[in-house]
UniProtKB/Swiss-Prot annotation:
Annotated protein name in UniProt: ATP-dependent RNA helicase DBP2
Organism: Coccidioides immitis (strain RS)
SUPFAM superfamilies for the chain: P-loop containing nucleoside triphosphate hydrolases
Compartmental location: Cytoplasm; Nucleus
Organism ancestry: Eukaryota, Fungi, Dikarya, Ascomycota, Pezizomycotina
Name of one Pfam family that matches: DEAD
Reactions listed under catalytic activity: ATP + H2O = ADP + phosphate + H(+)
Amino acid sequence: MSYGGGYSSSRDHYGGGHHSGGSGYRSGGYGGSNGYSHGNSNGYGSYGGNSHGSGVGSHGGGHHGDRMSNLGSGLKQQEWDLNALPKFEKHFYKEHPNVTNRSAQDVEAFRKEHEMTVYGKNVPRPVETFDEAGFPQYVISEVKAQGFAKPTPIQSQGWPMALSGRDVVGIAETGSGKTLTYCLPAIVHINAQPLLGPGDGPIVLVLAPTRELAVQIQAEITKFGKSSRIRNTCVYGGVPRGPQIRDLSRGVEVCIATPGRLIDMLEAGKTNLRRVTYLVLDEADRMLDMGFEPQIRKIIGQIRPDRQTCMWSATWPKEVRQLAHDFLHDYIQVYIGSQDLSANHRITQIVEIVSDFEKRDRMINHLERIMDDKKSKILIFTGTKRVADDITRFLRQDGWPALSIHGDKQQNERDWVLNEFKTGKSPIMVATDVASRGIDVRDITHVLNYDYPNNSEDYVHRIGRTGRAGAKGTAITLFTTDNAKQARDLVNILTESKQQIDPRLAEMARFGGGGGGGGRWGGRGRGRGGFTASNAAPLGHNRRW
């Protein structure tokens, strides 16, 4: 039998049912006055809202508006007396003789071959086979039954680190095998703890940004936890709470959750985190991207501070570094791949040197070419809210179906705009960096940097909105002489990803210096630009799309 919450164990498997509900939008228009509700457009005026903060659309993610920011306000502040807490075991790693006998040169060569860099004190050596990892036989047999030949690089180094009981940071691309890197040590951890008693919450908590990822993680834990009869549940928004509540009340050793729905459950008293001694933050960068940082902080505040914490991320921006600094203790880190700031190699990067006066014409030229393909979806970044409103108004008056999203827009309007963009009803969205933190749209084909950001990290972050999930993408950047101080960093990124470089940009890099200055988010902009302003500008009669 199947419920949309996803309780599973070796004894009974209530699958992590995919439910497409929870988008929070009802059909029907706002009326003709706003210039949007053409045909079957879902209207702003009938916005229903998702009562569980699962996000807009089917991703169950970053709906970080008024309600999300208040999530967790009902949670009681925990005061921890470590001496009074029950003791628990977290040190399981015993180095295999084969690993011990390898020379330091062999270890270094193995790490170099697999682009593996480690940081921290007394980092364990990597293992090269499943048997060397030191997992109990019941875990090894499950792994070998799946037909894996040998550990992936992140597993080779990550397993000894996680089994050692230390706090761990792992930076590796999606698809690198990181789920098993924390799942198998989690199973060993659970089996070393006392059994759950009545009213106990989970022992292992995995936080993930989206319901899709949460369900994938659940499938792995179900597969490898079967022989240990480990029970798990998947807790995410957009589906009925009943089955999830039922799972939690029965007792589960593992809870995989998106932050918003987990806080719902904690505030409602449906579970607690008193027994959690192994915490995983998966795709930490994406969770922060989606606006979940306040919720993550509130959740971690409910967990005993001597827990083991493992943080996994595809990138290592300063926000993720800050989270690690705040919540991990004396952590060890493994980095798979180059540590230079680099862009996704599936993205074609086009940088054009222009004057400020040429920007609008260049943008229109690109739109005319891009929007010939009706499947195209373009995200345009500006440096300020004022510019976002100005070019949205300009585009709409020229007949382009553009909408803007920034910090001065009301949350319900931002949600509505995002849904129009996701569904392709308005395939052009203009955004500032701050507002883009809540954008999790997989099928963006193009990113256009109308204004260049204040630093290279933000550039890589912006263009990473396209080329997701194995797809190709295109990023177009309008670069002016005012941006010259960023030229050297930009050329380095373009060179690393083997892109063509405009000779004028190369010249700027030689003479214009490097290293970005300025504030994190660019200018502040003036004016509120509410729903009756740029987004309400009627589409011009010369329909361009």
